[in-house]
A protein has these predicted regions:
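SF2 helicase motor core recognition
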Residues: 7-11, 80, 179-197, 213-218
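Conserved segment of the helicase C-terminal RecA-like domain
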Residues: 202-211, 215-225
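Structural recognition of the conserved hydrophobic beta-strand(s) that form the central parallel beta-sheet
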Residues: 1, 43-50, 178-181
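Conserved helix/coil segment N-terminal to the catalytic DExD/H
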Residues: 1-19, 30-35
Length: 225
């Protein structure tokens, strides 16, 4: 991991690598990543990301000089690489006016308080509108559990869930109709079976929103949108 490498940089020489490839490159401006890039002297540094806009507005041109290839979600949908989107906005009665912004997004603790009492409405929206395998993004573990209690067969996945792989397998097989997660399936997740995404976690971050919605855009047999 990036964190492990940062602690072990002294095991390498700065010129050990001619090429460095960075996945999830929207993180490249973070301190840990910069420590790695500043240490090594590769001939080329190449980054890949589906979400180049950081929530803290830090520009990636502090790390990368040129964009050599670019495609967006619209292009992917129009050219048959991603599913089309049918979007519906549901008013469930929460108020974010008192929630402060921290690091480019809503303060987590305050957001959790603001979303208190919305589980019934979220579960109702699922029952009325969800199609097929559904992935719900919750603000907190507490909210995820409250939502899951109200949906038959729903399973909660958090950072501490140990049998995550088997849950995803059962979900893909159609044995689990709905997964409610708390900031787990935003990055590095490939579950093409997802047909409906419910964003029950308000955000000011373009990147995070695109990541959540993007979980439902992978192609899968029998899935139209």
């Amino acid at each position: 991991s990036v964190q492990s490498l940062v602690r072990r940089l002294d095991r390498f020489r700065p010129d050990d690598f001619r090429l460095i490839i960075c996945d999830e490159a929207h993180h490249a401006a973070a301190r840990t990543y910069r420590a790695i890039f500043d240490y090594f002297r590769p001939e080329k540094l190449i980054g890949f990301t589906a979400t180049p806009n950081r929530g803290d507005k830090v520009r990636l041109d502090t790390v990368f000089q040129d964009i050599i290839f670019q495609r967006d979600l619209r292009w992917g949908i129009q050219n048959g690489y991603l599913c089309d989107i049918h979007c519906r906005r549901v008013n469930i009665g929460f108020d974010l006016s008192a929630v402060h912004t921290r690091h480019g997004d809503y303060a987590p603790g305050e957001l959790d308080e603001a979303m208190e009492g919305t589980a019934d409405a979220i579960a109702q929206a699922y029952r009325e509108m969800a199609v097929g395998a559904t992935l719900i993004f919750a603000v907190s573990v507490h909210q995820a559990e409250e939502i899951a209690r109200r949906i038959s067969g729903a399973v909660v996945v958090t950072a501490n869930t140990k049998d995550r792989a088997s849950i995803i397998q059962a979900f893909t097989a159609g044995e689990i109709p709905c997964i409610v997660n708390c900031m787990v399936f935003t990055e590095g997740t490939d579950i093409p079976r997802v047909e409906t995404v419910i964003v029950a976690r308000p955000t000011q971050s373009e990147t995070l929103y695109a990541q959540m919605v993007g979980r439902g855009l992978r192609l899968y047999p029998g899935k139209e949108r």
